[in-house]
A protein has these predicted regions:
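Zymogen propeptides/activation segments of proteases
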Residues: 1-153
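Extracellular hydrolytic enzyme modules, especially secreted metalloproteases
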Residues: 117-119, 123-218
Length: 218
């Protein structure tokens, strides 16, 4: 069967993706819009490749994703206001703040009135690294009931600005979460043994397994 699922990102062709950078009103960012443009688009980024390079190689040149990165959008609220479960509220507020500056129709690649994909970077580190309930765990999910300028905003992925030791987030986490946007499932033990068993998954050999953490740049 085809991998394509309802409202997912196209799996072949040259397409546009939007990356939204979100900051809080009481925090400062370490990395710039240009830094994330390199992470997403620069050929041979950091010696191993960018997000674009990864999906070009994995698709044997059939999927070419050009990412437009917004400037940092500073929210009205403090970090603690949104908390670890505030991703949808953050995204909604940030998109509303810049809706006059960006045309979401550019990122509806198939013209069906739905934004094909939205990749979000939030200031700071992710809960998967800090263990803090104040931080957001990187994930892929869906927004219900948000339409901006006639375009429905549904699927999104969200990742942190920093990975560890104040290093910029690696492409592995971004590629992993975006894999869900293409219709790919997780291939690791998603409940970490709480159901009474453990699943080794596909390990470091698969971006949807442990491969998102391979090396300094994922």
């Amino acid at each position: 069967k085809k991998l394509q699922v309802s409202n997912s990102f196209p799996t072949k062709g040259k397409h546009k993706l939007l990356m939204l950078l979100i900051n809080y009103n009481d925090t400062e960012t370490l990395y710039t819009q240009a830094d994330f443009q390199n992470v997403m688009n620069q050929e041979n980024y950091a010696g191993t490749g960018s997000f674009r390079d990864y999906y070009l190689e994995q698709s044997f040149g059939q999927l070419d994703i050009e990412t437009t990165v917004t400037p940092w959008v500073k929210l009205n609220g403090a970090k603690r206001y949104y908390g670890s479960e505030g991703a949808v509220a953050m995204i909604t507020e940030a998109l509303r703040m810049i809706e006059d500056e960006i045309d979401l129709r550019e990122f509806d690649n198939d013209g069906d009135g739905v934004l094909d994909g939205l990749t979000v970077i939030h200031q700071g580190t992710g809960q998967e690294m800090t263990g803090s309930s104040a931080d957001i765990w990187s994930h892929s999910s869906e927004i219900i009931g948000l339409t901006i300028d006639g375009i429905a905003v549904k699927r999104y992925t969200i990742q942190p600005e920093q990975q560890r030791e104040e290093k910029i987030t690696n492409i592995g986490v971004i590629c992993h979460e975006f894999g869900h946007n293409l219709g790919a499932p997780d291939f690791y033990d998603t409940d970490y043994g709480q159901s009474g068993g453990t699943y080794g998954g596909t390990g470091v050999w698969d971006i949807m397994g442990g491969g998102a953490w391979n090396g300094d740049n994922g």
